[in-house]
């Protein structure tokens, strides 16, 4: 059974992509039937299984896939074939482009994850960090822009 539908509310993004606001069709996790979510390009962007959800004005588009119990909030963007699994939580102005996120990862601030980077385990990435060019961050990592961890 489908857990959400696309509404008639749309935005044009990057000048050529139409994104649709989503509306929950049933209760699941902390989402109630009728709640409005963020924006997606196609239903393939957000799984109808489990408790994953896109909140606020967050966006998923261009072959992004969000699964399991992942939660994407605020103005975060997931795009360009990015995949997020597990109990990940993505906040603020994070951009995940072509990245792969697994597990109980938390990413917030103005972080950019790009170019096939893989972030997994109980990792937190925040502030103005960047993970690019096939970066791999393993379990129990903690990184911010004020650290000298090379991303």
Show where each model-derived region lies.
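Arginine residue identity/basic-tract feature
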Residues: 2, 21-23, 98, 118, ...
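Terminal amphipathic alpha-helical/low-complexity segments used for targeting or macromolecular assembly
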Residues: 1-51, 122, 141-151
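Short, flexible beta-strand-to-coil junctions
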Residues: 23-26, 57, 75
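Residues at the loop-to-beta-strand transition
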Residues: 44, 52, 58, 64, ...
